[in-house]
Amino acid sequence: MAGNTIGQLFRVTTFGESHGIALGCIVDGVPPNLELSEKDIQPDLDRRKPGTSRYTTPRREDDEVQILSGVFEGKTTGTSIGMIIKNGDQRSQDYGDIKDRFRPGHADFTYQQKYGIRDYRGGGRSSARETAMRVAAGAIAKKYLREHFGIEVRGFLSQIGNIKIAPQKVGQIDWEKVNSNPFFCPDESAVEKFDELIRELKKEGDSIGAKLTVIAENVPVGLGEPVFDRLDADLAHALMGINAVKGVEIGDGFAVVEQRGSEHRDEMTPNGFESNHAGGILGGISSGQPIIATIALKPTSSITIPGRSINLNGEAVEVVTKGRHDPCVGIRAVPIAEAMVAIVLLDHLLRFKAQCK
């Protein structure tokens, strides 16, 4: 399995499985003399960790990160930063029934077909549990971006099922409100509707999809390496690598299909851009406007409603998922998406500095 690393100058490699001893990552390319401790990383992990509200999986993990290397006397040394998070609340016995069966909609079938073996306990490497280390690495990237470039990377939940929040304008979002409710939602009226929907889904044993938006503000002009390492292409690659993500939009995204050129083009005046339909990226290069990326996440297939599938012998079976799972994986995906955007931006900033200035 060779796809465990992302980035060129700022490189993140993760390892570990859902029910293994621990999760870990190696972060290369962090510039020296950045003040860093576990306290800088833990808040984002706490936003992502399971068991923090009645709307997410009841699996409880402290997700306490430990820095193993790359930091001396409270500052980064420029060497590889190693981090681990120990797993503590595994219930592997919950997955005995699917040892020889494939859960429909999961990676069970494809992992088995590709590798001839799979860790069926909680999905193993394919579990969203792995994303904890992405969040840890992303927290480092976010700190460096904020302190050295004034760049803020923040996200919010914009839709669950058919419930959409009111349109949000960049610069007018109440981020304290976003982080004060379990849905990471800036629209109070939508929070109540989300609550009602999730409660109903939990009674039914079903799940639902979601959409969330990440905004990066104060990104300078010039990030992106055409033609194959365009900034939007790398953002899409990183965001599509998140479990359950089935679609990525930059700026207006798929809505451009209904727009005319006279509407979509972001006209300019001596005072700046008149609009931001492009989401802060033109020709694969950042324009200096806020970068706006939206992702769609599928409803998790880990539900208690019986589903048809096959076993290792290709025979028809019925699968009922046990274990503890999220009724909507999009809720905890906000800090994960923020992390992936931050990782890409820092990588491109370092590449920009090396080549252009």
Curated annotation (Swiss-Prot):
It catalyses: 5-O-(1-carboxyvinyl)-3-phosphoshikimate = chorismate + phosphate. It comes from the Bacteria. The keyword Flavoprotein applies. PROSITE patterns: CHORISMATE_SYNTHASE_1, CHORISMATE_SYNTHASE_2, CHORISMATE_SYNTHASE_3. NADP(+) binds at R48, R54. One of its GO terms (biological process) is amino acid biosynthetic process. Disulfide bonds: none annotated. Residues 37-49 have a biased composition (Basic and acidic residues). InterPro entries: Chorismate_synth, Chorismate_synth_AroC_sf, Chorismate_synthase_CS. Keywords: Amino-acid biosynthesis, Aromatic amino acid biosynthesis, FAD, Flavoprotein, FMN, Lyase, NADP. Its EC number is 4.2.3.5. GO terms for cellular component: cytosol. GO terms for molecular function: chorismate synthase activity; FMN binding. FMN binds at R125, S126, S127, N243, A244, G283, K298, P299, T300, S301, S302, R324. Its cofactor is FMNH2. CDD domains: Chorismate_synthase. Residues 37-60 are annotated as: Disordered. HAMAP family: Chorismate_synth (MF_00300). Homotetramer. This reaction introduces a second double bond into the aromatic ring system. This is Chorismate synthase.
